[in-house]
Amino acid sequence: MKIQSVLGPVDTADLGQVLMHEHLTCADWSMRMNFGSRFYEGDKVTEMACGMLGKAAQQGVATVVDGTPVNLGRDVHLMREVARRTGLNIIASTGFYYQEEPWLGFRDEEQIYDLLMGDCTDGIQGTDSKPGILKAGVARAGVTPLLNKVLH
């Protein structure tokens, strides 16, 4: 059996010790686009992530599951670079967290499904990386009508 990593399928027998819920970065895309390096210094983030996860690899970690959802700044290019440099299997996610976002209210279930399935079939952010997990997080208020639509 295989699972998708950001660098391609990995046999589950080769996953080794797994960090199940990590976030290489949580950096809002609208902030990144509007403020650039004043808000997000990609090279520094990459170096920091490689340093920290490189230490984890030295301690026996072989796989990292990055649960950063689309709307919290998931960055597959960062994940791919960290995977290449550290030798770790990095598993990306697709899906949303606290989905009370206005744009979701204007989409029907099929459109939301198509967005997420595009990650799974076409790849994430213009790459051939595909998600290995589906993120489905909700707020303390529970499943609202909008969240019910998204989760469905």
Identify what each model region corresponds to:
Residues K2-E22:
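N-terminal basic/disordered segments at the start of proteins
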Residues E81-R84, N89-H152:
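Active-site gating/metal-coordination segments in enzymes
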